[in-house]
Amino acid sequence: MVKKALAALGIVLVLQSLFALCLVSAMQLLVLRNTPFGVTGASPVVNAVTSKVSLETLAYADESAVMEAIGQSKLHGAYLPGQASDTLIVVPAKSFFGRVEIEAAFGDAAKKLERPLTVKTVKPLPEYDRLGGVSGLLLIPLLIGGYLAAVLLLKATRTAAAPWHVAMLVGYATVGAVLTDLIAGPGIGAYTNDHFWPLLPCFILIAASVALAAAAFQRLIGPLGTLEVATLFIIVGGSAAGGVGISLLPDYWQHIGAVFPPQHAITLVRNVIYFDGNSITTPLIVLGLYALGGGVIVGYLGRRRPVKMVGAPAPAVAPVRLTRLTRLTQSKPRSHSPRARRHSSGSSSRWRSPRSCSACSPSTT
């Protein structure tokens, strides 16, 4: 018992250390890295900024092309050099902290080079989401809820996979998405009511992808699948989600996060709220693959292969033995009954018990 307790606490310490390592390394600096940034021409201001800030400059023909790219959620900002003055376009909805760094860097460079600069804000953040953190906050209940749904369903049914698990988890995802949407939208006012219906299928997909994928891991790996899902989806995937902006993460975390649902979930919600649902094809495909793959594994293996039972009671061996013993006892004649005594007294001439045998008894002489 003590060894099991120490082993369990040791596993928790490992997970805690891993969570601290992932989260701090991902969120510690919050500086722009390989950030897509549009330009419409050469400028010494842009050269000065790119020497200090990691920007991936993309050339566009004119301002209208830049605005179209921003509307597609492809740029964090743009610089438009002019004859008398230049224009800096910032996009707070893409990343609030990214906007702060971009505006400060270009403001300092333009001031040093004595270049007049006008700052233009596109896709501003509303008062009820001044830091743009709603998309990241909405991920937490959907992610944790989907994970807990798979874990508690396994614990309640002691069944790692079954065809009806898919229907139950999808039903949970639907109800949970409706509740989350009602609370965050009309209830608290984290976004306007006209986003209620566009966000509802997104919430369902996010919760279902996590729940079904978690159930699939449990079916394939066994009880350790629960621990595996917590490690991959919550500790690693959550650290690389990019709630403050994907471009603010280190490069390796940007690539790691692209493999797991949390980063795509935040991108999906953010683009639906602030970018009219543009550039959501990739998040929909990734989340859909997790949901579809998990559902197929849970449903198919639950139907075609014997279902693994977790924590099933041991077979009742003792009652079987007792039953057999009872039958053997009942099959013996009851010598103490009156009928048995009458039968023994009537047949004493033909049968004697071993104790009454004179040949076997000791001599009394």
Name these PLM-found stretches:
Residues 1-12, 131-138, 156-170, 194-198, ...:
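N-terminal export and membrane-targeting signals
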Residues 2-32, 139-149, 234-238, 290, ...:
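Hydrophobic alpha-helical transmembrane segments of multi-pass membrane transport/permease proteins
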Residues 34, 50-59, 191-192, 196:
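A local structural motif
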Residues 43, 50-124:
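Extracytoplasmic loops/domains of multi-pass membrane proteins
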Residues 76, 112-151:
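Membrane-helix interface and discontinuous TM-entry motifs in multi-pass inner-membrane proteins
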Residues 134-242:
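Transmembrane alpha-helical segments that form the functional core of multipass membrane systems
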Residues 198-324, 339-341:
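Membrane-spanning alpha-helical segments of multipass transporters and channels
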Residues 326-329, 334, 338-342, 350-355, ...:
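Cationic, amphipathic, low-complexity alpha-helical segments enriched
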